[in-house]
Amino acid sequence: MIEFEITELNRRLANLIVLGKVVEADYTLTTPKLKIKAGDLKTAWLPMLTQRAGSDLSWWPLEIGEQVVVLSPSGDLAQGIVLGALNQLAFPSIGNSADSHKQVYADGAVIEYNRKSHHLSATLPSGATTTLVSDGGVNITGDVVVTGSITASKDITDKTRSMQADRDIFNAHTHSGVRTGPATTAIPNQSQ
């Protein structure tokens, strides 16, 4: 009897914290679940930890092949919870600075912020698009450089006037002193 109890205690102790890999995932459930393989052991469906699950929510699920930690209350793997991923040879660390927060996606997209250099970078793969919906407006403080075309569905205005006002001046302006030949005209009667 005591041997059985010691064996059971040893099994439970060994199952308190288990390292394994995600081998199955079901993201369709209200509480997404994973199956983990650790050596010859394969768990039942277990819930995975998320960053937020209250009035604010987050979604970035663990995937098949990721190395994880399973924490099992009382050493009962049926009650286990899958904690976050661990780097491994197949998926090494992508950073080497405590000042950098970096996310790299499977399609090549990279989003990184460095708090020391105060630099935010978002690089998307070729053909990617970006949508920002902010019906209250967007305010940018600082110089803006655009490489490529700018399209606007409404007028564009600077500190002097709008582009439409400039077009109106250009289309309606006149010059005095107009003569034929090589001479130039006087300045416009209405400044731009």
Enumerate the predicted regions with their spans.
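Protruding loop/beta-arch "assembly-hinge" segments enriched in small, turn-prone residues
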Residues: 172-192
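Exposed beta-strand/loop interface patches that mediate assembly or binding
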Residues: 1-117, 188-192
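Low-complexity, small-hydrophobic/phenylalanine-enriched stretches
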Residues: 113, 120-140, 144-168, 179
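Generic detector of intrinsically disordered, low-complexity, polar/charged segments
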Residues: 36, 51, 77, 81, ...
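Heptad-repeat coiled-coil amphipathic alpha-helices that mediate oligomerization/assembly
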Residues: 2-13, 156, 166, 170-173
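Generic signature of intrinsically disordered, low-complexity segments enriched in small/polar residues
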Residues: 7, 108, 162, 173-178
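Short, electropositive, low-hydrophobicity segments enriched in small/polar residues
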Residues: 58, 84, 88, 146, ...
